[in-house]
Structure formats: C-alpha cells, structure tokens
Amino acid sequence: MRVLRSPAKVNLGLWVTGKRADGYHDIVTVFHTVDFHDRIFIKRSHSLKIKTSSPLIPEGEENIVYKALKRFEEWTGVSPEVEVFIEKNIPAGAGLGGGSSNAAVVLKEVNSMYGEILSEKELSELASTIGADVPFFLKGGLAVAEGIGDKLRFLDKKIEREIFIIYPAVHVSTKEIYSKVTPDILTKKEDLHIIDSLLDDFEYFLENIENTLGEIALESYPQMREVYNTLEYLGYKPFVSGSGSSIFAFGKPEAEIEKICQVKGWKLIKTVLR
C-alpha cells in the first residue's frame, strides 16, 4: 500500500478577464500549494473502489477521483484496479482545491503504477478534462494560471511563508459566484502588470493583489465577511482563496484568533506555503 500526501492550495490573487463563448470565464490567478493535506491510501485490488473518511464527500461514481480514473481508462484502455481511501482534512467548498488535488495525486500514482503509460503532457491534458485546477496539482508549488485556470506557467521559486487559514464552515458554490460576475468588474489582461512583481517584490505584490470572485463571495456570504472583518480588525491583511469560503493571512495567528475560532466554530489551519 502507498500513502500519498494530497496538498491544499491558496490563490494569491484572482482576476476575471472575460467571459468565453462556452459560458466559462477567463481568469488570471496565482496558485501556491501549502503544507496542509489529505492523506490518500492506495493499493492494487480486483476492482476500482473509492472510499473517504468524510460523510460529506461522495464515494463511488460521484467521487472526482472515480471520475478521473474512469477518464484514465477511456484514454489508455487500461482499467485501473485499485482501492483508494481518502482521509479528508481539507474542507469541501473552501476554495482550497481538495477534490482537484485528490484527483491529480491519484491520477499521477496510477499512471506510475501502470508504467507511465501517459506522458507528462498527456496526463496534464487528461487532468484538464476533470477540472480546471487538476493539472496544477500534478506538480504543485507556485504557478501562474490563465484561461479557465488550466494554462499554467510554473515558477521555479517557492515562497516559503507561514500562513494561517480560517474556514468558516460554509460551503461556497463557485458556479453561483461566477454567475454574479458582471462586465464592469472585469480586468483587462494587459493591465495586470502586478504579476511581474510576484518574484521581484513579493511584499508589493501582496499589497496590491485583488480577488474578483472573493469580493463577490464576501458580499454573498456573511460568514466569510465576519472572518475577513475580524482579521482586519486585529491588524492582519486577509485574503480570500479562490471563490471562498476560506480566508487566509500571513504570519502566525494570535491567541485571540484561536479563541475566536473556537467560539465561532471556525476551522483554523496553521501551515506554510510550500
């Protein structure tokens, strides 16, 4: 049996640049994996089985990992006979990419088990048919993503910083947030000079990043707004990951934040960018 780490990610900014003919939106965002993860146990079996530790995550055909492995079978003609157990730590609907990460990690492992039947490029192409974030998690680290999030430019440098993430126990529908995007809040791609400062001046980058979807989510979900305002009041600069619902900040959380999270029932995650 193999035990794999399936990391979460945060978005360091997210700009919506347009709406496509197929109904999806083009974005520019910066992904970075963090040292907070699900654990995945995988072994060979006589059939494909997917189980999870969370009653909130579907098993079997409705699970994103199951769908990914069935797509693998379609592409390769190889039926992956494996048993997968996902020990969930990353909350669902939190903007942390848990499901996409699970799919990518298992796809990569199964491809390895069957002798690298797909090249790195082919595996990434397959992953993009599962979900926009899935190709990123095949490698992780730091990347600038464009298109629907599937056009990736990985950066060699990693930004090792302590961060903490607060999940306010509310599931955000990304589809709902995208439906509220209006033309007046779109960003022209040519105006995104801030991306150039990502490696040269990270502090400047942090001071000036925006999150179009995050701003909509803050107006739509009072629980998120409460977390955001609490962090601002305590002197932190808060950021929304993806379309929410997680809010994160750099540094270590004060004892007061830990107490507030306990009282409010918010999940506090202390981790680092990695």
Swiss-Prot record:
Database matches in Pfam families: GHMP_kinases_C, GHMP_kinases_N
Catalyses which reaction(s): 4-CDP-2-C-methyl-D-erythritol + ATP = 4-CDP-2-C-methyl-D-erythritol 2-phosphate + ADP + H(+)
Group of enzyme by EC: transferase
InterPro entries: GHMP_kinase_C_dom (IPR013750), GHMP_kinase_C_sf (IPR036554), GHMP_kinase_N_dom (IPR006204), IspE (IPR004424), Ribosomal_Su5_D2-typ_SF (IPR020568), Ribsml_uS5_D2-typ_fold_subgr (IPR014721)
Residues at the active site: K9, D133
Protein name per the record: 4-diphosphocytidyl-2-C-methyl-D-erythritol kinase
Organism listed in the record: Persephonella marina (strain DSM 14350 / EX-H1)
Cited PANTHER family: 4-DIPHOSPHOCYTIDYL-2-C-METHYL-D-ERYTHRITOL KINASE, CHLOROPLASTIC (PTHR43527:SF2)
Keywords: ATP-binding, Isoprene biosynthesis, Kinase, Nucleotide-binding, Transferase
Pathway(s) it belongs to: Isoprenoid biosynthesis; isopentenyl diphosphate biosynthesis via DXP pathway; isopentenyl diphosphate from 1-deoxy-D-xylulose 5-phosphate: step 3/6
Matching Gene3D superfamilies: 3.30.230.10, GHMP kinase, C-terminal domain
Domain of life assignment: Bacteria
Residues that bind ATP: P91, A92, G93, A94, G95, L96, G97, G98, G99, S100, S101
EC number: 2.7.1.148
Stored HAMAP family: IspE
Gene Ontology molecular function: any one: ATP binding
Family, as annotated: Belongs to the GHMP kinase family. IspE subfamily.
